[in-house]
UniProtKB/Swiss-Prot annotation:
The EC number(s) this enzyme carries: 2.7.7.6
GO BP of this protein: DNA-templated transcription
Organism the protein comes from: Zymomonas mobilis subsp. mobilis (strain ATCC 31821 / ZM4 / CP4)
Keywords of the record: DNA-directed RNA polymerase, Nucleotidyltransferase, Transcription, Transferase
UniProt subunit comment: The RNAP catalytic core consists of 2 alpha, 1 beta, 1 beta' and 1 omega subunit. When a sigma factor is associated with the core the holoenzyme is formed, which can initiate transcription.
Gene Ontology CC annotation, any one: DNA-directed RNA polymerase complex
Superkingdom as given in the UniProt entry: Bacteria
Main enzyme class: transferase
Taxonomic path: Bacteria, Pseudomonadati, Pseudomonadota, Alphaproteobacteria, Sphingomonadales
Pfam family, one: RNA_pol_Rpb2_2
Gene: rpoB
Function comment: DNA-dependent RNA polymerase catalyzes the transcription of DNA into RNA using the four ribonucleoside triphosphates as substrates.
Protein name: DNA-directed RNA polymerase subunit beta
Length: 1401
């Protein structure tokens, strides 16, 4: 028996060599950007992940309470109506999900974790006399409350086996908004100001001015009330209301007038009609009719002027601040708010009132709005006001004091019914300058007063109205919050049921389980994930479309806008979008501007506002400290652009710097700058940041470019672009398309379907020391494209955490690769590229450059019918052997079979109802249980338009139904795979553990040994270990106690890891053998996957990244294509007229730079070939170092990359040169990319003409074209609009029930409509018979079309057209209008006349 012994030196050497063979990027992108980014881009899908994580899991260590727990705590405790019992929430726990993600995808079930909630039922004893409660009994129990869907690592959900994304929603932030009607309501055109308090949930409160300048309030958009009614209801009286809004002035009677205190501010710029006299000295300070200058007013104050004497007439028109009452009789001379008139002033004079407190209303800076409202208000005190509010809210019900109180309290002050949320409170505090903790989420009296005060100030011209479209007033609700709201609704429904249950059972005997019925809560969650407008089928066309879908922000959806009602303002780009929402990427069409994409660096803060990062500027020096700001906070700063020039210390070079301040662009002096952008691409979204030379494209075309990249189909061979932007790697990594290493380690095994990595470094207890990555092989995506992953590493490679191990669909070497680089010439060619058509070379089709694989899924179910069970079988009536050639003995198609339209995929027979039976037959049937003997063929056949290869078959059986041979074979295969995994994991675990053991045992003194020949006290060496089987090494005991403890720790870790492997294996085998959960009535389900290879063909849509889209018009043989001087034919010919009017010049820059990249690649290739020739007759270990290649690479990449290239090993240099042969990849980041000078320099370096144009020759004649033509490499994409999916031909298909005309559309197997204009064309040609045929036998003449069919079958070619069915429908419609229309045939003249007479009578 061979023993496993690892020599220590060998072990360490292998470790070192493995680390030496470290992971380095196989290919370098030459970057043109100069701006160094100080902060890493946040993970692109963390928005989704963080939001859901915060919803699901509390973090006790930092005191964070999860959204789920908050929701549960807001509904519990539930008390019964009598107060005898209460059901309280203790904690919740999410268990391990029953199936993992892959199993859920295959079985079509939801990936979710069972949720257990610990509830406590407390029963009280209520003393009937004192009504005190004492606890009688407390019971705790864990209650199962349904499954909570879990998010996958990539930010998606699996609901019923399909991958879905919950899109974030943008809505109006809770808080207060001040606005005006822009003068549209009233004919005079004056602005009517309004304020609205928007809660997170609860009643809306609107304050508004009307045309008469009265301030009104509406609750929940109901009838309006004077605002003072609301203030009375809050407990204020008239005097308090007036005092809150106005200052008072004390008037004291003097000689010949009234004395008032002198306030300089109120006299500046006024022109008095009377002499203004010093109240103390009696001299004239300001003469009548002379304007008082601000300087004179201030001087008078400084000279000691304190009181003025003004004539009595001047006091008229002021308003009293208090009630003036005759103390002795209680008679009111003048009420608070009343106007002072000669009449009531005379009364006051007679009563001897010498001082008056009047309101400071000057009708200039302070208007009498609240005073006027108070006087117009019918209510006079709190009770009146409450009754008035009650009448508005509940019209027709008589108010009592208690119900009115309760209603008013419940509207705004009851946390159960009204919730501003923390966000709303923060917004309220900021707008109204209040200081209230964000835990107070109901309204307070002072909040309402502050809102009214601010509204009145606006009317008086103080302050600004808010901008609704500012991102400071719109917030984002992500998955967690949306689900939390939905779950709360479900829990509240459940609460009602629980309360009713509590009052109907004996609480002392039941357990919490008997009271709770979790169905409403579970249904709410299921409904949210299954059918909410924001839960969408994930766009899986390519990795970019996945990432953008998860980063989408929609203003539509429940509680949001609707397409029809959204105006232009909401959709428009706003200055606050900068760095938060992309101004480019949004759909064309009705949703434009309503569906947006987050910008690259933006993130969402805890209040739901979008933040973007900036670098701080301290003492005029730009630091590397980064702060994230929301739109509200940003308005205080002046922000410089990311491309502002800095010197080595970080100071601005220019005196004036291009900057943004309060939404405006300006040139600001450098001392004024307080922040600076982090990166030029923080402005745009992920898709837009992938467009090179974006800055040279028109915005409309850039929008199309970003949208079309999301529709690019993944091709059979991915190729990264020559001209990229440097974002390709980030997208590939964050989308999860390429597999990244979770932990560092050494690659142990690699094959096409899995990668096994032995982890290095410390392994956490209970975690396996082995990572197995399963690769997806030819799986179907949501869009029927093909998901296929290919390993990039080889055995023995050392990988770091985060390194790319395998490429996925549309990725190459860990970079996003949506299309292919092709050689393009810009020139017209015989009209084949007129109006954006594209002419392509046959080489592209022949070499499968744009070939893609599409996988269709077909499923068939065998159900239990009334007449007996359906059966999946090969034995089908009336079907020849030829039709069954692809089926196995179970009647299911083989994997690898090539199928054509109409071929049987799964044979299935269904029992058929027979002719009526006699009673005797029925009786026999009932006794012997025979089911129907007659069957019909209901097999699954391949629909028209699909032909391909079967790549996968899955059979699902109901629990308890016998499995057929095919199902058994699939199950055996699965178990073999699981066994192999288990054995590999064990082998690696053993290897790693024994190496550890050996390290710890060598050189130790034996205290006990597994075999007698090893004596106590001996030293352990290699020979000792070699004489014992490795699995018995655990039985060694050593004298060193510390070392012995280490050995025991290794043993415990080994045992627990081994146990985990065993358990995982058994669990998976059990799942594979267990029956599947199928829909009710289904016995068996078979899914068949057909792969179709789609080559490029005329009618397919292609596009570049700059919005330059077109349809292929012709595929031309390569020899007819225009060719270069060296004989290379171009791949694609585009029309140059497509560029000027579209203004997407980026494509021309890309062409030139791509041409240079190809030329530089050729230089590297020649160097590599020279080196290979020099070493042609040497062995590998004797090769000369590839210095010539290294030098050439340094020359191509420039000094910036010299260090990196010099530090690489010879082997890596050769490998990298091999990857650069076709072209050197370059990156030109958006807004910081290659300048025209850089492109010229690259072209010169590659030895090409720096005009970017070459002489082309006509492929058909061989003659040179008159002028040079722009030729270069463009990255072209094949879009998901394939002609194969659109074109179809109808033979005999379904007809509409009413009109009997053929249906329309491919899905209904419909015909082409011969419409009004087409009829005109035939009429114009006089083609009467053709037209008659079109309108009758080819359409809806039911009898006629049957006769035509019979005639054709008999070989006869005479037939007659009858009456179209649509004529009959018309007649019936006229009947329904009471018009009798019938067809009469005339036999003779007189008969005809008589019938007319009858009709006339």
């Amino acid at each position: 028996m061979g023993r496993l012994v690892v020599k220590r030196e060998d072990y360490m050497a292998t470790k070192a060599s493995a680390i030496g063979h470290a992971s380095v990027k196989k290919r370098i992108r030459k970057m043109f950007g100069n701006i160094h980014e100080v902060v890493d881009m946040p993970n692109l899908i963390e928005v989704q992940r963080d939001s859901y994580e915060n919803f699901l899991r509390s973090r006790p260590e930092d005191g964070y309470v999860s959204g789920l727990e908050k929701t549960l705590r807001s509904v519990f405790p539930i008390r019964d109506f009598g107060g005898v019992a209460e059901l309280d929430f203790v904690q919740y726990e999410l268990e391990e999900p029953k199936f993992d993600v892959d199993e859920c995808r295959q079985r079509g079930i939801t990936y979710a974790a069972p949720m257990r909630v610990t509830l406590r039922l407390i029963v009280f004893e209520v003393d009937p006399d004192t009504e005190t409660r004492s606890v009688l009994d407390i019971k705790e129990q864990d209650v199962y409350m349904g499954d909570m869907p879990l998010m996958t690592r990539n930010g998606t959900f699996f609901i019923n086996g399909t991958e879905r994304v919950i899109v974030s929603q943008m809505h109006r932030s809770p808080g207060v908004l001040f606005d005006h009607d822009k003068g549209k309501t009233h004919s005079s055109g004056k602005f009517l100001f309004a304020a609205r308090v928007i809660p997170y949930r609860g009643s809306w409160l609107d304050f508004e001015f009307d045309a008469k300048d009265i301030v009104n309030v509406r609750i929940d958009r109901k009838r309006k009330l004077p605002v003072t009614t609301l203030l009375y209801a809050l407990g204020l009286n008239a005097e308090q209301i007036l005092h809150h809004f106005y200052n008072t002035i004390t008037f004291v009677r003097g000689d010949g007038g009234w004395k008032v205190p002198y306030v300089a501010e109120s006299w500046r710029g006024r022109k008095p009609f009377f002499d203004i006299i010093n109240g103390d000295t009696g001299e004239v300070v300001f003469p009548a009719g002379q304007k008082i200058s601000p300087r004179a007013a201030n001087k008078a104050g400084r000279d000691g002027l304190e009181t003025l004497l003004i004539p009595t007439e001047e006091i008229y028109g002021h308003y009293a601040a208090y009630d003036v009452i005759d103390e002795s009789t209680g008679r009111i001379w003048i009420e608070a708010g009343d106007e002072v008139t000669p009449e009531n002033l005379e009364l006051l004079d007679n009563a001897g009132v010498a001082t008056l407190e009047l309101l400071d209303i000057d009708h200039v800076s302070t208007g009498p709005w609240i005073r006027n409202t108070l006087k117009a208000d019918k209510a006079e005190d709190r009770d009146h006001a409450l009754a008035e509010i009650y009448r508005v809210m509940r019209p027709g019900e008589p108010p009592t004091k208690e119900t009115a109180e309760a209603l008013f309290y419940g509207l705004f002050f009851d946390p159960e019914r009204y919730d501003l949320s923390a966000v709303g409170r923060v917004k309220l505090n900021m707008r109204l300058d209040l200081d209230c903790p964000d835990t107070v989420t109901t309204l307070r009296a002072e909040d309402i007063l502050a809102v009214v005060k601010t509204l009145v100030d606006l009317k008086d011209g103080k302050g600004e109205v808010d901008d609704i479209d500012n991102l400071g007033n719109r917030r984002v609700r992500s998955v967690g919050e949306l689900l939390e709201n939905q779950y709360r609704v479900g829990l509240l429904r459940m609460e009602r049921a629980v309360k009713e249950r509590m009052s109907s059972v004996d609480v002392s005997t039941v357990m919490p389980n008997d009271l709770i019925n979790a169905k409403p809560a579970v249904a709410a969650v299921r409904e949210f994930f299954g059918s909410s407008q924001l839960s969408q089928f994930m766009d899986q066309t390519n990795p970019l479309s996945e990432v953008t879908h998860k980063r989408r922000v929609s203003a539509l959806g429940p509680g949001g806008l609707t397409r029809e009602r959204a105006g232009f303002e909401v959709r428009d780009v706003h200055p606050t979008h900068y760095g938060r929402i992309c101004p480019i990427e949004t759909p064309e069409g009705p949703n434009i501007g309503l569906i947006n994409s987050l910008a690259t660096f933006s993130r969402i803060n805890k209040y739901g506002f979008i933040e973007t990062p900036y670098r701080k500027v301290v003492d005029h020096k730009v630091t590397n400290e980064v702060i994230y700001l929301s739109a509200m906070e940003e308005s205080r700063y002046t922000v410089a652009q990311a491309n502002a020039e800095l010197d080595a210390e970080g100071h601005f070079v220019e005196e004036l710097v291009s900057a943004r301040e309060a939404g405006e662009f300006l040139m600001a002096p450098r001392e004024q700058i307080t922040l600076m952008d982090v990166s030029p691409k923080q402005l745009v979204s992920v898709a837009a940041s992938l467009i090179p030379f974006l800055e040279n494209d028109d915005a409309n075309r850039a929008l199309m470019g970003s949208n079309m990249q999301r529709q690019a189909v993944s091709l059979v061979r991915a190729e990264a672009p020559f001209v990229g932007t440097g974002m390709e790697e980030t997208v590939a990594r964050d989308s999860g398309a390429a597999i990244s290493a979770r932990r560092a380690g050494i690659v142990d095994q690699v094959d096409a379907s899995r990668i096994v990595i032995r982890t290095t470094g410390e392994i956490e207890a209970g975690k396996p020391g082995v990572d197995i990555y399963r690769l997806m092989k030819f799986q179907r995506s949501n869009q029927s494209t093909c998901i296929n992953q290919r390993p990039l590493v080889s055995v023995g490679d050392y990988v770091n955490a985060g390194d790319v191990l395998a490429d996925g669909p549309s990725t190459e070497l860990g970079e996003l690769a949506l299309g292919r680089n092709v050689l393009v010439a810009f020139m017209p060619w015989n009209g084949y590229n007129y109006e954006d058509s594209i002419l392509i070379s046959e080489r592209i089709v022949k070499d499968d450059v744009f070939t893609s694989i599409h996988i269709d899924e077909f499923e068939v179910m065998a159900r239990d019918t009334k007449l007996g069970p359906e059966d999946i079988t090969r034995d089908i009536p009336n079907v020849g052997e030829d039709a069954l050639r692809n089926l196995d003995e179970a009647g299911i198609v083989y994997i690898g079979a090539e199928v054509q339209p109409g071929d049987i995929l799964v044979g299935k027979i269904t029992p058929k109802g027979e002719s009526p039976m006699t009673p005797e037959e029925k009786l026999l049937r009932a006794i012997f249980g025979e089911k129907a003997s007659d069957v019909r063929d209901t097999s699954l056949r391949l629909p028209p338009g699909v032909a391909g290869t079967i790549v996968d078959v899955r059979v699902f059986n109901r629990h308890g139904v016998d499995k057929d041979e095919r199902a058994m074979a699939i199950e055996r295969e699965e178990i073999e795979r699981l066994t192999k995994d288990r054995e590999d994991e064990r082998a690696i675990l053993n290897r790693a553990t024994y190496a550890q053991l050996q390290e710890k045992l060598l050189g130790q003194t034996v205290a006990a040994a597994p075999y007698k020949h090893i004596v106590k006290g001996a030293r352990i060496d290699i020979e000792t270990l070699a004489s014992v089987e490795p699995h018995k090494w655990f039985k060694f005991a050593v004298e060193d106690d510390a070392r012995q403890a280490e050995l025991e720790a290794i043993k415990n870790q080994y045992d627990s890891a081994d146990e985990a492997i065993r358990k995982r294996f058994e669990d998976r085998v059990e799942k594979a053998q267990r029956g599947d959960e199928l829909p009710p009535g289904v016995l068996k389900m078979v899914k068949v996957f057909v792969a179709v290879k789609r080559k490029l063909q005329p009618g397919d849509k292609m596009a570049g990244r700059h919005g330059n889209k077109g349809v292929i018009s012709r595929i031309l043989p390569a020899e007819d294509m225009p060719f270069l001087a060296d004989g290379t034919p171009v791949d694609i010919v585009l029309n140059p007229l497509g560029v000027p009017s579209r203004m997407n010049i980026g494509q021309i820059f890309e062409t030139h730079l791509g041409w240079a990249a190809r030329g530089l690649g050729a230089k590297v290739r020649t160097a590599l070939e020279e080196w290979r020739e020099a070493n042609a007759d040497r062995y590998e270990w004797d090769f000369s170092p590839p210095e010539v290649v290294r030098e050439r690479m340094i020359e191509v990449y420039g000094e910036k990359y010299a260090e990196d290239i010099k530090s690489r090993e010879d082997r890596e240099i050769v490998e990298m040169a091999g990857l650069l042969r076709n072209g050197v990849p370059m990156a030109t980041p958006v807004f910081d990319g290659a300048k025209p000078e850089d492109i010229s320099e690259m072209l010169n370096l590659a030895g090409l003409d720096d005009s970017g144009q070459v002489e082309l020759y006509d492929g058909r004649t061989g003659e040179q074209f008159d002028r040079k033509v722009t030729v270069g490499y463009i990255y072209m994409l094949k879009l998901h609009h394939l002609v194969d999916d659109k074109i179809h031909a109808r033979s005999i298909g379904p007809y509409s029930l009413v009109t009997q005309q053929p249906l329309g559309g491919k899905a209904q197997f419909g015909g082409q409509r011969f419409g009004e204009m087409e009829v005109w064309a035939l009429q114009a040609y006089g083609a009467a018979y053709t037209l008659q045929e079109m309108l009758t036998v080819k359409s809806d003449d039911v009898v006629g079309r049957t006769k035509v069919y019979e005639a054709i079958v008999k070989g006869d070619d005479t037939f007659e057209a009858g009456i179209p069915e649509s004529f009959n429908v018309l007649v019936k419609e006229m009947h329904s209008l009471g018009l009798n229309v019938e067809l009469k045939t005339s036999k003779a003249k007189d008969e005809d006349d008589s019938s007319f007479q009858v009709a006339a009578e």
